[in-house]
């Protein structure tokens, strides 16, 4: 699997050769291309590109000052989109849905079709005056990305945050395996 450089940050991405149009798969927070493993047989034969975001497996770490700039993830996805010949189909989940929506706004001529599940607008908090929301989000990001959690602890915190405390531990083993 190849890598690209975006503003001095190394991004790993899954690339599967196949027929056009390309499917650009944008994963959720905390997940990488493995999130789509059950989807791949359904689109077998298509060209697939799926970036691993900053600080995710096989991608580099944040090198900037202060908090991680999520716009860098967008720039990586945009770079991959613009490398493709012709239009692409975008499939995005959660954070990946947010990135996909931004790509569609900024590059409508490159998008043939798009499908998003639970797109979250994390980036909107950068433009709000609500310090309480910024602080809560900052704590979540810090917990998820900068405390050096083991993968299992990260998944527990992430799933519990978006659901209820204990949600991760109450999942059936085969459901947890889908996240790993």
Go through each PLM region and give its residues.
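Structural signature of beta-strand start/N-cap positions in the alpha/beta core
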Residues: 22, 47, 87-89, 111-113
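Short "lid" loop at the C-terminus of a central beta-strand within the Rossmann-like core
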Residues: 55, 118-123, 160-161
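Gly/Ala-rich beta-loop-alpha elbow adjacent to hydrolase catalytic centers
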Residues: 92, 96, 100
């Amino acid at each position: 699997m190849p890598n690209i450089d975006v503003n001095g940050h190394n991004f790993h991405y899954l690339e599967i050769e196949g027929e056009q149009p390309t499917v650009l798969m944008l994963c959720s927070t905390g997940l990488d291309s493995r999130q789509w493993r059950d989807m791949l047989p359904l689109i077998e034969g298509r060209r697939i590109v799926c970036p691993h975001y900053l600080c995710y497996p096989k991608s580099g770490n944040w090198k900037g000052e202060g908090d991680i700039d999520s716009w860098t993830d967008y720039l990586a996805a945009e770079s991959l989109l613009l490398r493709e010949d012709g239009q692409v189909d975008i499939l995005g989940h959660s954070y990946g849905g947010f990135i996909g929506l931004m790509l569609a706004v900024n590059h409508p001529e490159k998008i043939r079709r798009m499908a998003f599940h639970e797109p979250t607008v994390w980036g909107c908090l950068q433009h709000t005056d609500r310090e309480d929301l910024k602080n809560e989000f900052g704590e979540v990001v810090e917990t998820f990305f900068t405390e050096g959690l083991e993968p299992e602890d990260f998944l527990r915190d992430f799933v519990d945050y978006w659901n209820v405390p204990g949600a991760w531990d109450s999942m059936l083993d085969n459901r947890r395996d889908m996240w790993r």
